[in-house]
């Protein structure tokens, strides 16, 4: 189970965007994710008339490693860690849910 999922509010812990908050929009693989408004780089693009693209400088959001972000706890207003708690579901099966380590509150889906 991934501790940080698409739609979670995260805060950047390290790098040039330290302290910025954003929403996870995409998981690239097991260790990298794309956060909206964070790690924006400028790419120089050539014009391609076959694809109908114009050349110039394009801003693009690049992936960031998941170790450099932490989930944002709205109740405390700070970064928090994620834990996994096993509970009994309605049908009697075991269900794993994500919880905040500081308070033990369940993390709701976005």
Swiss-Prot record:
**SMART domains assigned:** KOW (SM00739)
GO biological process, alphabetically ordered? translation
Record keywords:
Ribonucleoprotein, Ribosomal protein, RNA-binding, rRNA-binding
Which SUPFAM superfamilies does its entry note?
Translation proteins SH3-like domain (SSF50104)
Query: Which InterPro entries has this protein been placed in?
Result: KOW, Rib_uL2_dom2, Ribosomal_uL24, Ribosomal_uL24_CS, Ribosomal_uL24_KOW, Translation_prot_SH3-like_sf
Q: Which GO terms describe its molecular function?
A: rRNA binding; structural constituent of ribosome
Cellular component (GO) terms are: ribonucleoprotein complex; ribosome
Q: Which family does it belong to?
A: Belongs to the universal ribosomal protein uL24 family.
Q: How does it assemble?
A: Part of the 50S ribosomal subunit.
Summarizing the function annotation, the protein's role is:
One of two assembly initiator proteins, it binds directly to the 5'-end of the 23S rRNA, where it nucleates assembly of the 50S subunit.
Record-given protein name: Large ribosomal subunit protein uL24
């Amino acid at each position: 189970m991934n501790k940080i999922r698409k739609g979670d509010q995260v805060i950047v812990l390290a790098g040039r965007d330290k302290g910025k908050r954003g929403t996870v929009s995409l998981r690239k693989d097991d260790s990298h994710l794309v956060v909206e408004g964070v790690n924006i780089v400028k790419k120089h693009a050539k014009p391609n008339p076959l694809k109908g693209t114009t050349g110039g400088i394009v801003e693009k959001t690049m992936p960031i490693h998941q170790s450099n972000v932490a989930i944002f706890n709205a109740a405390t207003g700070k970064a928090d860690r994620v834990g996994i708690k096993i509970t009994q579901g309605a049908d009697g099966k075991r269900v794993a849910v994500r919880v905040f380590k500081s308070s033990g509150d369940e993390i709701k889906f976005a």
